[in-house]
């Protein structure tokens, strides 16, 4: 799997976004091992988080359950006290600091948020840039974490880290696309467990499936975010 993903990324003409009005950020897509049944209890109130979301239409209750097993990626639940995107699902990541590359930033944020120190030799490649409504261009960096990494999330930023099996990305009900009156572009939804992951994280995960796992080069940067993620 490692070489397949590496080769698929290497053979892809990556879409880079250059927009001086947006800030640059990077996220770490970390591939690891996982065991069936190691899901943890979500510390965020699902009922509160689901308020106003159309979960019933997707026959989901918002709980991240039964997602582990086999090759997996790391997914974080952001702390509820954060000033932006509080309690949302996200990949480890953040702003690219002056003098850093996207790879530098992804490795640093992974270390700061999840307590994992990986080297540049673990980089399998980059996915396409994704421009967000909140003023960022996100560069996803795919990393090979290998076996059983010890996760030590920083509680002021991350309240939970899940190992989500890659099989979740290839479910029969994934991906989902819906329309919203605020935009002509389709909103992408990626079902994981009993929850829905939206762009930008959802777009990154969809390209991880399409390009990384299946060798499919379809773009995802025009897929829309839900309105609650625009700020």
Model-identified regions with their sequence ranges:
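N-terminal leader/linker segments that precede catalytic domains of diphosphate-processing enzymes
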Residues: 1-90, 95-112, 116-149, 191-231
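NUDIX/MutT-family hydrolases
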Residues: 153-192
């Amino acid at each position: 799997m490692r070489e397949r993903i590496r080769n698929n990324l290497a053979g892809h003409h990556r879409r880079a976004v250059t927009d001086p009005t947006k800030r640059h950020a990077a996220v770490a897509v970390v591939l690891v091992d996982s065991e069936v049944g190691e899901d943890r209890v979500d510390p965020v109130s699902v009922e509160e988080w689901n308020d106003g979301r159309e979960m019933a239409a997707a026959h989901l209750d918002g709980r991240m359950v039964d997602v582990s097993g086999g090759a997996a990626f790391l997914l974080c639940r952001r702390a509820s006290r954060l000033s932006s995107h509080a309690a949302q699902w996200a990949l480890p990541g953040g702003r690219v600091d002056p003098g850093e590359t996207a790879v530098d930033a992804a490795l640093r944020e992974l270390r700061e948020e999840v307590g994992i120190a990986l080297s540049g030799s673990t980089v399998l490649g980059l996915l396409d840039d994704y421009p967000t409504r909140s003023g960022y261009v996100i560069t996803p960096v795919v990393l090979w974490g290998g076996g059983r990494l010890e996760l030590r999330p920083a509680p002021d930023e991350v309240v939970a880290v899940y190992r989500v099996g890659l099989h979740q990305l290839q479910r029969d009900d994934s991906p989902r696309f819906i329309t919203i009156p605020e935009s002509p572009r389709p909103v992408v939804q990626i079902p994981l467990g009993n929850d829905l992951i939206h762009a930008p994280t959802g777009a990154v995960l969809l390209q991880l499936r399409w390009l990384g796992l299946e060798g499919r080069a379809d773009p995802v940067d025009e897929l829309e975010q839900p309105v609650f993620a625009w700020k």
